[in-house]
Amino acid sequence: MSGLVMGTPWMLQLERPVESRPGSQLVTRSKHYPYAGGVSEYTQRSDEELIQPIILLVDREDPAGEHHGIAAAALASVQAFLRDPENPDWQDWSSAAFGKTVRRADAKMFAKVLAAFPEHALVEVGEGRAAGLPPMPAAALPKLLAKLQVSGTQLPRGEPLPPAPLTIVLNASLEMSTGKAAAQAAHALFAWVLESKPGTVEAWVADGFPLSVLELPAKEFRKGARKSAGPVIQDAGRTEIEPGSTTAYVSATKVR
C-alpha cells in the first residue's frame, strides 16, 4: 500500500464515448459505461496514442501459476494508477483507446525494468509477479520495453488462488492465452475501480487488495455476468478470439 494516494477521487473524465474510439474494446453493463477496455497489443496505433505497459514475470526456471500471474498483472495495472491518479497522462490515456499491453520478461529482464522505471508498481500474488507503469506513447515505447515479447505468453496452470472478496471471472470457453487473459483481467479490475465508490475502493485497498481469479464455462460465465460488481468486458477481437466476445468481469462478495 505504500505510495498509494488515498482519499482522492479517481473518476476520470472522458471527452468522448466509447463508440467513437477506433479499435477499442467495449465495456457493457445494464447502464452505459463510458470506459473502453483497450485496443489489441498488436493493433497499429497512432503516434499520439498512450498505452499502459504491464510487465509479467515469466521465470524460465520456475514459472508462476497462471492465475497468480493474471492476478498480479491486473493489480499492477490498477496500483500504477492509484499511486499517482492525478498524473495528467492517465486523463489523456482514458480519453483515448484506454489500451494496455502485457509483455513478458524473464527474471533478468524483469529486474532491469524495475531498475529503469522507478515509478513502477510492483505486485506479488502468490508466485506471480508483475509491474505496472503509467501510460506512455505506444509508438515510442522505450527500447527496454519494446523488445519484450507480447504474443505467446503462457504460464502453467499451477495452483488456484484462494477465494477472496473480489474475484476476476474469466470466460474459460475462449481458451485465452495467459497474456490475453491478463490484459482482459486488468481491463475488468480497472473498470471496477473507476466505477466503484471511492470508499469501496479504499476499503479494498486497506484490506490489502484481496483478489482471486476464476474461470467459468460460457453458460455459467453469462449467468454470473448478470450480477457482476462492475462492467463486463467485451473484446474487439483482433487477436485470439472473435469480435464481441465477452471476456471478463469482477464479482464481489464482501467488498463494502
Question: Language model features by range: what are they?
Answer:
Residues 10, 29-212, 218-227, 231-256:
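Positively charged, small/polar-rich N-terminal and surface patches that mediate targeting and assembly
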Residues 1-36:
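N-terminal amphipathic/basic-hydrophobic helices that include classical n-h-c signal peptides
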